[in-house]
Amino acid sequence: MKQLFRQWYDLSEIKKELTTRNWFPATSGNISIKVSHEPLTFLITASGKDKTKTTPDDFLLVDHLGVPVLETELRPSAETILHTHIYNNTNAGCVLHVHTTDNNVITNLYSDAVTLQNQEIIKALDIWEEGATIHIPIIENHAHIPTLGENFRKHIQGDSGAVLIRNHGITVWGRDSFDAKKRLEAYEFLFQFHIKLLSIQGGVSNGANSYS
């Protein structure tokens, strides 16, 4: 029980911080944190909640299938399946899914992936070589959630990672809440920088193709 309260507090603090950045517009987004490994349980945001508010109903505890462990009227977030795929296939401890203007714009510039390179902040992703290059996959935003989940699952390759969904934000996961938040901040910085650079250069260039 102590672990549950500790993780609840941790997830609540992350929600507050990301809310101050307006990364949960119009009740969008969802975040989760692992509570136990065997059996697998995790806390996830309840569906349709105003994330600028803090209430006792912000999160609910679900199992490895995303089904509530305790009787509740709350519904887990619509994209819970993405979280279950991550936790069932990795040792990740935290998953963050947010909608920002920048990450949505990026998915309209590129088709299957965006490639970013030679930025110091890439080291926040535990990539240390000089002039490092990263590739972030982009998948289609299928309305059929099982199809979305299956396409997403194909890109889960480790205990940390990120996947962009076209016009539907980014999902980032990490070893724990600190790692996941650090990675999310790094990706959002890279997207903002890339878009600003393209605007200064006079438009889409360097391999980017308008996908809208």
From Swiss-Prot:
Keyword Amino-acid biosynthesis (UniProt): yes
Binding locations of Zn(2+): H97, H99
Molecular function as annotated in GO: methylthioribulose 1-phosphate dehydratase activity; zinc ion binding
GO BP annotations listed: L-methionine salvage from methylthioadenosine
Pathway listed: Amino-acid biosynthesis; L-methionine biosynthesis via salvage pathway; L-methionine from S-methyl-5-thio-alpha-D-ribose 1-phosphate: step 2/6
Cofactor note: Binds 1 zinc ion per subunit.
UniProt subunit comment: Homotetramer.
This protein's name: Methylthioribulose-1-phosphate dehydratase
